[in-house]
Amino acid sequence: MPEAQDTVPRTGGADARAREPLRSLARALFDRVDTYFDAAFGARANPWRLLGALAWYLFWIVAATGIYVYAAFDTSAAGAYSSVERITANAWPLSGLARSLHRYASDAFILLTVLHLAREWAHRRYAHVQRFAWLTGVALLLFVWLSGIGGYWLVWD
């Protein structure tokens, strides 16, 4: 008589690691970094566990500085590059600082967003109850990508 087959799905342990080596490697890497950051900052203040919140904070910095810089920006193809030079030379109070902050906060925002996406994927936080949050995050990633392309095109250099 054949043995009864296991009807319980295997979702964890060594079997899952064998089926998904990339996800297991990514999760091990994120967990290792979590350990180091927990030791340095404590579990509650670990910035590695707060990637989404930090990205959201940077989004608002990018939005505020973008509005400020856009107010002094010439959107025509002929005047765009010269207006960036004028903004950098402090046409308005702190406009050069605002432009630099906008640029570097945008880069950090993209980096933290991608790291947050990878961390959530590695920890399987995209299924069941969290599916809606995952899908809206992926849609927002597309919006961020298109906004970034638009921001680079505005300079016309």
Question: What do these predicted ranges mean?
Answer:
Residues 1-157:
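Membrane-embedded alpha-helical bundles that constitute the cytochrome b-like, heme-associated redox core
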